[in-house]
Each structure stands twice: as structure tokens, then as C-alpha cells.
A protein has these predicted regions:
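Conserved catalytic-core segment of nucleotide-activated headgroup transferases in glycan assembly
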Residues: 122-199
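Short, charged/polar "capping" segments at the starts of alpha-helices
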Residues: 5, 56-58, 100-104, 124-125, ...
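Structural motif
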Residues: 1-2, 45-53, 73-74, 92, 96-98, 138, 178, ...
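Donor nucleotide-activated moiety binding/catalytic core segment of transferases
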Residues: 37, 184-242
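C-terminal alpha-helical cap of glycosyltransferases
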Residues: 300-338
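Catalytic binding pocket for nucleotide-activated donors in carbohydrate/polymer assembly enzymes
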Residues: 90, 111, 116, 234-309
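Active-site and donor-binding regions of nucleotide-sugar-utilizing enzymes
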Residues: 1-124, 236
Length: 338
């Protein structure tokens, strides 16, 4: 229910000094209209969202310049950015790193300021679990299963994931390697994820770790694995930037599932519908045998472009600094933390 204060503010927005185009935009989007009225009625100094690709939040940041609006990136962004460029124009974006900034700029996104601070989730994980995990598993499959995602919206992801899961399961069975699965679904869809897995593998032969965001269960099982394998999951890119051995796989010609902007012959990429099980196995043999120090030497220049993890401050500390500065009225300008 709308408070009287918000209703009065909505009337003021329509009858006040805003231009005709702005008033038309508000009438056309009632939710935007209500949110702007709510913000206007409480006059905040800072407005933050963890939904970085929200068109409404971008619009609000332009319609209400008196506050510091900050969108915090919550997932990896690929070539789909070009399709959203028309509305990705938030005034301040806290992003994973250089790849995100370059992708947004090259796609024509009118973002006011980029703060390349890394991944907030990854930072919270590293703060809670600062010690390097002891390796318990040879391989980890990073699940990206979500019921609607696989059945309706991303059939290519479903195809890639099934192919990858079957290849990896067979490889581990043949080579005597241990396999863990980092679950994707939260408790409300856990049963469906388990049913999906049982269609393609024998779950009694693997260690399945359900996704528990509060305990960072997926992050932990990835760090406890010698090699993690995924299609293009955000948590995979985070682990890759922490120095983990991660292999990204796309068994189609669809660039949506590629690691963007990177030559496909890299040791951490498997790509193409022509990839055979034999080729897949040879790649995994090579990655598994590499020492971590050698792996990091081969990958970290690229990895840090995706998710910055090398700065002295954790992402949450950088975020606190930005918000504290905005609360004190000291607005920063330009791109930070390059």
C-alpha cells in the first residue's frame, strides 16, 4: 500500500517542474513512478542495488541526481550487454573488472562512473574463509541448472551442461578420479536439480553439494577441487580469478556461451561442436597435471580482467569506502581502481 506521503509526492512529480518527456516516462512506467516518489519523499543520500542490469534503477539514477546511486554487479556479463545498452546508463557501477567496463563502453552504455572493485560475493567469501582450502576432489562440475532456464530460456546452456556433465562423469569413472558437483539451485528447487542429475549420471558415485549461499557451499567445494569445469558460470570466473584451475566449455558455435574476447586456444577453454570425448579427456589430463604455480602464470593476466582479486582491499571494503564518501558529500569522479 502506498503511504499518503508517497501519493502526494507522485502528484508533485506530475505537477512540478519536470519536463514533459520525463512526466510521460513516469506515467508509462507506474513502478518507476512509485519508486521515484518514494525516493523523493525520503531524500536519501545513497541508493544501492544488487541488480546491476535494472533498467528502472538506471532511470532513477538519472531522474534523481541529488542522491548517489550505485549498482553493484551480481553476475558475469557477456555479449548480451549489447542488447541492453540502451538502458544500461546508471550513474555509478561497481563492477567485477576491466572486462565489464570495456564491454559496457564498447557496447555504447552511458555509465557515468565505473568502480572496478571485484565481486562482492567473492570478497565476502574470502573474508570469511581466508585460508586456502585443502584439495579433496580431483574435479568439480559447477552446475548452472535452474528449471526454467534449462527448459525454456537457455536451451543452449542446457545442451552444453548436459554434454559437459556426461563427458566429465565418464572421464572421472574411466580414470578413477573423484568428482564433486557444486549445486546451483536453492532449497526451493533442489529436488528438481537432483532429478535432473539422476537422468544423466549415477549420483552415488559423486559428491553432490547443494547450494547454500549463507555457507558459501559452492565456493568451498570448488576451492577443495583440483580442477573445476563449467560452461560460463559467474562463480567459475570468480574461482578462476582466485587462481583456481577452471576450464570453460562451449560445445556449440553460439558465442553467447564463449569466454568473451579471448583466443579459443587458451589452456582453460574448450570450444566447438566438433570436440570429441577424446579431445576433452586430453585437455583435462593436461590441466589436472599442471602445478598451480604454472597454471597461475598462464592464466592470471586474463583472469584479473574478468574479476579483480589482486587489489589490497576486499570488494566490500571498497564498497564501504564509496558509500561513506557519498554519505559525507564527497562525490568521486572518473574510473577507480584501474
Amino acid at each position: 500500500n502506498l503511504s499518503l506521503r508517497v501519493v502526494l509526492q507522485m502528484c508533485y512529480l506530475l505537477l512540478g517542474r519536470r519536463g514533459l518527456n520525463e512526466r510521460r516516462a513516469l506515467i508509462a512506467d507506474p513502478k518507476l513512478f512509485m519508486e521515484l516518489a518514494e525516493i523523493d519523499s525520503i531524500s536519501p543520500k545513497v541508493v544501492v542495488t544488487f541488480v546491476d542490469n535494472s533498467s528502472r534503477f538506471s532511470s532513477l539514477s538519472r531522474l534523481y541526481p541529488r542522491a548517489f546511486f550505485l549498482a553493484v554487479q551480481n553476475g558475469f556479463r557477456g555479449i548480451e550487454v549489447a542488447d541492453m545498452a540502451g538502458y544500461l546508463n546508471v550513474t555509478n557501477l561497481f563492477c567485477f573488472g576491466e572486462d565489464t567496463r570495456n564491454r559496457y563502453q564498447n557496447s555504447g552504455c552511458d555509465v557515468g562512473r565505473y568502480i572496478m572493485g571485484g565481486s562482492l560475493k567473492d570478497g565476502l567469501y574470502r573474508e570469511r574463509f581466508p585460508q586456502e582450502e585443502k584439495v579433496e576432489f580431483d574435479f568439480c562440475w559447477i552446475s548452472q541448472f535452474r528449471p526454467k532456464r534449462f527448459s525454456e530460456t537457455l536451451p543452449g546452456l542446457a545442451h552444453n551442461s548436459i554434454t559437459l556433465l556426461q563427458f566429465l562423469y565418464e572421464y572421472c569413472k574411466e580414470s578413477g578420479k573423484s568428482l564433486a558437483i557444486a549445486g546451483s539451485c536453492k532449497s526451493n528447487a533442489l529436488t528438481e536439480e537432483i532429478e535432473f542429475l539422476r537422468k544423466y549420471i549415477d549420483l552415488t558415485r559423486v559428491t553432490f553439494v547443494p547450494n547454500d549461499p549463507l555457507e558459501f557451499s559452492s565456493y568451498q567445494v570448488i576451492d577443495k577441487s583440483e580442477v573445476s569445469v563449467t560452461v560460463n558460470s559467474t562463480i567459475g570466473f570468480e574461482a578462476f580469478s582466485r587462481g583456481n584451475k577452471v576450464v570453460f566449455c562451449n560445445f556449440t558455435n553460439d558465442p553467447y556461451y564463449d569466454v568473451p574476447g579471448i583466443a579459443q586456444q587458451k589452456p582453460w577453454i574448450i570450444r566447438g561442436p566438433e570436440i570429441t570425448y577424446s579431445q576433452f579427456s586430453m585437455k583435462l589430463d593436461d590441466v589436472h597435471q599442471k602445478k598451480r604455480e604454472i597454471w597461475r602464470g598462464l592464466t592470471q593476466i586474463d583472469a584479473q580482467k574478468f574479476v579483480k582479486t589482486t587489489q589490497s582491499l576486499l570488494p566490500q571494503e571498497i564498497l564501504r569506502r564509496e558509500i561513506t564518501r557519498a554519505m559525507s558529500g564527497k562525490m568521486a569522479v572518473g574510473t577507480e581502481l584501474e
